[in-house]
Design a protein with these regions (language model features):
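SAM cofactor-binding core of SAM-dependent methyltransferases
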Residues: 1-42
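Acidic side chains
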Residues: 17, 37, 57-60, 94-95
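Generic enzyme active-site microenvironment
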Residues: 13, 35, 60, 113-114
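Accessory recognition modules or surfaces
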Residues: 16-32, 58, 156-158, 162-168
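Class I S-adenosyl-L-methionine
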Residues: 44-56, 66, 70-187
Length: 187
């Protein structure tokens, strides 16, 4: 919703779960809607995709966070195929951040925002974060991450989220300041 409120046009959507996709389409009305696994999207030949999807200003992705959530199974589910709620397809979820980076390599946006839970920075999951950095760097992007806390941003909940921000090497975003100091409105 933030992009919409900021006046951005939402051009496309890739979502495997029909119910989630329906809500997204109703909220954002993307010009191009791909109801499919992102792995299948990445297999579509570039010449079969709308040219508007290449060299975007911003590409945003939020790979499922259940495998990194401190409330979830974490390490026990890593690398295992399972029937998850998303699309009810048997799949692994812990590698979808890397699959999203393959999408970045395909579409070549100027800026990439990828969101996940704070748990991706904790314990053994830190290796996933390091690999995210390595993979972005290997396709010509510099990357940083910011931990944002909802209660400090005027959101009435204590949700902590990590935002990986990647840019092409010629894009200067090194001094981005995302510090918020709103009075918490949690109850």
């Amino acid at each position: 919703m933030g992009y919409k409120l900021a006046g951005c046009d939402v051009l496309g959507c890739v979502e495997i779960d029909k119910k989630m996709n329906d809500v997204y389409v109703k909220n954002h009305n993307p010009k191009y809607n791909f109801l499919m696994d992102i792995r299948k999207f990445n297999e579509i030949p570039n010449e079969e995709l709308p040219q508007e999807l290449f060299n975007l200003d911003i590409l945003d992705g939020s790979p499922p966070c259940t495998t990194f959530s401190m409330a979830g199974e974490r390490e026990e589910s890593w690398g295992k195929k399972k029937k998850f709620r998303e699309g009810q397809a048997e799949q692994t979820l812990d590698d979808l951040s890397f699959v999203f980076i393959e999408t970045v390599a395909k579409l070549k946006p100027k800026v990439v925002i990828m969101e996940n839970v704070e748990g991706i920075l904790l314990g053994n999951a830190i290796e996933y974060s390091r690999e995210i950095y390595r993979r972005f760097n290997s396709i010509g992007y510099k990357v940083m991450h910011k931990l944002l806390k909802g209660e400090q941003m005027g959101v009435p909940q204590t949700r902590h989220r990590v935002f990986f921000i990647a840019t092409t090497l010629d894009f200067d975003l090194d001094n981005i300041d995302l510090n918020f100091n709103y009075e918490p409105i949690t109850y």
